[in-house]
Amino acid sequence: AKIFSDIGWHSTVIEGGYKSYRKAVLGDLDYLPAKFRLIVLSGPTGTAKTHILRLAAESGLQVLDLERLANHRGSLLGSEPGSLQPAQRLFESRLCATLQNFSPDRPIFIEAESNKIGQIHVPSALWASMRQANRVSLTAPIDARIAFLQRDYRHIIEQPDHLIELLTGLCQRYSTATFDLWKTTIKARDWHGFVHNLLKTHYDPS
């Protein structure tokens, strides 16, 4: 802090150091979610939930974008190209700072997520509030969802070998015949057929 002050930067010292800061973050994450009225945007994969929420944020609504904070889209294929997820503690610090900037007088819109986004765990108090919140459910025709996913995941489609490698994470859940079908459609560049089968087999039943 002294060095920063010497060069003209404003700085403060946290009494108790990092342990004190960390305790404050965890304390805030325990009680802050209950202060807010959450509205959860849900719907099947491919209904553009994340895009809708980001447009809502641009229009001035309060939006808690967990996928952006976690740098992950929240599914097997959700890792962002060329970047890593933050450490759990960094995610929690960013989440805490975001919640502190919200007004309890206005609702917070948030996407339906599992309690784990990639390797990041959603804090239990926030997860409990999400489960109890009112929901807005999106729907879209299957062909519209397929077309959207082909555009939104173009970075994966352009790397078919990497896509097949990612899908090996599902090998234990599905039959060899199913996995072979996925590989066949990928190698044939039949993206409509591949996405349709993946939705029907993996995403929609869950």
What are these regions (language model features)?
Residues A1-S20, A24:
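Thiolate-centered catalytic microenvironments shared by cysteine-dependent enzyme domains
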Residues K2, I120-P123, Q150:
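Short amphipathic alpha-helical segments
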Residues T12, I39-L41, Q62-L64, I110, ...:
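Hydrophobic/aromatic beta-strand patches that form the interior of the parallel beta-sheet core
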Residues Y21-L26, R73-G78, R145-F148:
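Short, charged, surface-exposed secondary-structure boundary motifs
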Residues L29-F36:
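Phosphate-binding P-loop
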Residues R37-E58:
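Glycine-rich phosphate-binding P-loop
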Residues E58-S129:
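Conserved nucleotide-sensing/catalytic segment adjacent to the nucleotide-binding pocket
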